[in-house]
């Protein structure tokens, strides 16, 4: 009977540890979502894709 109590206590501690870690993860994800700044616009002098078309064109050397 004593062995059953020890196993039960270990399982309870593992469950508590798992819930603690889950709470940490969820809290971190909520914090990241709440502090995300998705409204950032590119600076006016930022290179446009059309400005780099000559760099992206494949060159074939013969």
Swiss-Prot record:
Q: GO biological process: what's one of them?
A: regulation of DNA-templated transcription
Its name, as the record gives it, is: Transcriptional activator rinB
Where does the source fall among the domains of life? Viruses
Q: Which organism is it from?
A: Staphylococcus phage phi11 (Bacteriophage phi-11)
Q: Residue span of the signal peptide, if any?
A: none
Its biological purpose is as follows: Activates int gene expression, probably by providing stability to rinA. Int activation requires both rinA and rinB.
Keywords (alphabetical) are:
Activator, Transcription, Transcription regulation
Q: Which InterPro entries match?
A: Transcription_activator_RinB
Q: Does the keyword Transcription apply?
A: yes
């Amino acid at each position: 009977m004593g062995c059953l109590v020890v196993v039960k206590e270990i399982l309870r501690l593992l469950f508590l540890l798992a819930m603690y870690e889950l709470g940490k993860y969820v809290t971190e994800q909520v914090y990241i979502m709440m502090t995300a700044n998705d409204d950032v616009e590119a600076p006016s002098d930022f290179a446009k894709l059309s400005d780099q078309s000559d760099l992206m064109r494949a060159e074939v050397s013969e």
